[in-house]
Amino acid sequence: MVVLATGVRANLDLVTQLGLDVGQLGGAVVAPTMQAYRRGRLVPDVFLAGDLVQSESAVMPGPTMSQLGSSAVKEGRVAGINAAGGKALSGPVASPWVSVIGDLQIAGTGLSQGLASWYGIETVSGKAAGSTRARYYPGGTPLTVKISADRVSRRIVGAQIIAGEDATGRINWLTAAVVEGVTADDFLVRAENAYCPPASMVQDVAIKAAEDLCRRLNQ
C-alpha cells in the first residue's frame, strides 16, 4: 500500500474572475458573515464558504485555512442565512479532525507541536495512555491522548488522540477547550467525565494527560 499526502489547494478560478481579494495564505478573504471583499470593501450579495476561504484561527492571531467538511458546513450555514437576508456570524476555527485507519481512530485539533513551532509558539506537551473502558471490563481498546499548551500563557493550543474507539467525542471535548482559550490548569480544575465501566474509565485519559501537562509546565 502506498499513501501519498499532497495537501489541499483552493480552486480560486471564480474568485479571480470576480476580482475578489485573496489573502496571504492563498484563500479568499471574507468577513465573519462570509461576505467577500474586493479591494478591501465588502461585495454586495457575494458570499463564500468552504475550502477556498481563509478562516479566523481560534488558536493564534490571524487567518488559517480550515479545509475540512465540518468547517465548510459551519461556514455554509452562515453564508446561506446571510444570503437569504438573515443575520449570522462565523466564529474562529480550531479545525478538529478524525480519521479511521484500519482498527485505529486518529484525531487532532488546534496546533501540533511542529506547527506551533513553525508559528513561533513554544509549547509543552503532556501525554497519558489508558483504555476506552474500565480496565477490568472486556472490549476496551488502548487510548493515548496528547495535549499541548503554550509554555508562557499555559493555554491549551492543540491535542491529538489515537484510540480504537470513541476518539471523536474526546477530540470534540478538547476542541471546546482550545476555542475557549482554556489553560491547562483550568482544564484540570473544571473538566469532568461521565463514568460507566462499559463506556469509560473512572478518570478519563484526557484528564490524566492534562495532569501530566501541568506537571511538565511546572518543571
Task: Describe the residue ranges of each PLM region.
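Short beta-strand-initiation
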Residues: 1, 23-25, 94, 111, ...
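A short alpha-helix-loop-beta-strand transition element characteristic
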Residues: 21-25, 86-97, 122-126
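FAD-site-proximal beta/loop scaffold in flavoenzymes
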Residues: 1-78, 173, 177
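Flexible, glycine-rich terminal cap/loop adjacent to redox cofactors
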Residues: 4-6, 104-109, 119-219
